[in-house]
Swiss-Prot record:
Record-linked NCBIfam families: PRK09489.1
Function: Specifically methylates the guanine in position 1207 of 16S rRNA in the 30S particle.
Main location: cytoplasm
Catalytic activity: guanosine(1207) in 16S rRNA + S-adenosyl-L-methionine = N(2)-methylguanosine(1207) in 16S rRNA + S-adenosyl-L-homocysteine + H(+)
Cellular component GO terms held in the UniProt record: cytoplasm
Record-annotated membrane-spanning stretches: none
Complex and partners: Monomer.
Family indicated by similarity: Belongs to the methyltransferase superfamily. RsmC family.
Keyword rRNA processing among UniProt keywords: yes
Protein source organism: Cronobacter sakazakii (strain ATCC BAA-894) (Enterobacter sakazakii)
The protein's name: Ribosomal RNA small subunit methyltransferase C
EC number: 2.1.1.172
Signal sequence coordinates: none
Pfam family, one: MTS
Length: 342
């Protein structure tokens, strides 16, 4: 990452205020400012594996990835800088976790784009850390308060679930389509044949619903699931366990931690990164899939109909077909041949 996000640019206006502070950075960190900010000590906690990849190179063990924060990296911080995400339940989970570990008196800064709903931080933290707005620039707000009362926090109390047919889908704040099966995934599932065999990889697995439904009618399938999101990784593991299915679930930035080749790769790829529209992950998925598919294997993805994926599929695989479509979504299939662009 080279350029700074609008939220980081607002923080840089106040950089002189943090030079003596032991800062914990958390939330939706879209750049490497935590590694470059002038502080007495900088540490970072993130639930996003691709953010950890960027920050861990310059910060080493001072950057941590996981569902909940490590108490050891939080305890001696005297300042929290929290980047507000677009998902309010995700923000609430993270902030309650962090504030339950930080000492009373900690300086708390919350920064985010106005369109992300950062204003709601005031009401959310009112009982624990009353906030005041201290700056407004770049269509962002910066809020400050001091921790007055640690909240109670138990991650086990944040789980939710819903049913898809006879399957139990486990979810957590921050997981895509947390409240029920989304229309795109449902369309993709309608194209999957019973009794599928071989090795199947679900990229961007979310709560694990695609893999769970596939396993329910294809018991011989061998599953691997991956996602950048720590809540998604934990939710997918819980979904498989709740339904008695086996499979490996790994944190991975698309294929970064994936080894070997598969007979099918399925995905409902994201096209947002934070508040911004981003096709990078989906294009990486398509272009790199050929290095993770067996000959004759296939990539099957669902996407918003307006997204420009057919050209990328044809450039990479030399073929694609539309298996199903609605006014909003299309399910694409591309088959791995010997002439694919590897």
């Amino acid at each position: 990452m080279s350029g700074f996000s609008p939220a980081s640019e607002v923080l840089l206006r106040h950089s002189d205020d943090f030079t003596e502070s032991r800062v914990l950075f958390a939330g939706d960190m879209q750049d490497d400012l935590p590694a470059r900010f002038d502080t007495a000590q900088s540490r970072a906690h993130t639930q996003q594996f691709h953010h950890w990849q960027v920050l861990s190179k310059p910060m080493g063990d001072n950057a941590r990835y996981g569902l909940v924060a490590d108490a050891e990296i939080v305890a001696d911080s005297d300042t929290l800088i929290y980047y507000w995400p677009k998902n309010k339940p995700e923000a609430q989970f993270q902030l309650m976790n962090l504030l339950s570990l930080l000492p009373v008196g900690t300086d708390v800064f919350v920064v985010g784009e106005n369109r992300s709903g950062v204003r709601s931080a005031e009401a959310m933290l009112e009982a624990h850390c009353p906030l005041n707005k201290v700056d407004s620039a770049r269509r962002c707000g910066l809020y400050h308060g001091r921790l007055e009362k640690q909240p109670e926090f138990n991650a086990d109390g944040w789980w939710g679930e819903y049913q898809v047919d006879d399957l139990t889908i486990k979810t957590l704040p921050g997981v895509f389509s947390r409240d029920g099966l989304d229309v795109g995934s449902d369309l993709l599932l309608s194209t999957l044949s019973p009794h599928t065999k071989g090795k199947v990889l679900d990229v961007g697995c979310g709560a694990g619903v695609l893999a769970a439904v596939l396993a329910s009618h294809s018991p011989k399938v061998r599953l691997t699931l991956c996602d950048v999101s720590a809540p998604a990784v934990e939710a997918s593991r819980a979904t498989l366990a709740a339904n008695g299915f086996e499979g490996e679930v790994v944190a991975s930035n698309v294929f970064s931690e994936i080894k070997g080749r598969f007979d099918m790769i399925i995905s409902n790829p994201p096209f947002h990164d934070g508040m911004e529209t981003s096709f990078e992950a989906a294009q990486t998925l398509i272009r790199s899939a050929v290095r993770h598919l067996n000959i004759g294997g296939e990539l099957r993805i669902v996407a918003n109909a307006f997204l420009p994926y057919p050209n990328v599929l044809d450039e990479t695989f030399g073929n694609h077909e539309v298996l199903a479509q609605t006014g909003r979504f299309k399910v694409y299939r591309a088959v791995m041949g010997r002439n694919a662009k590897r």
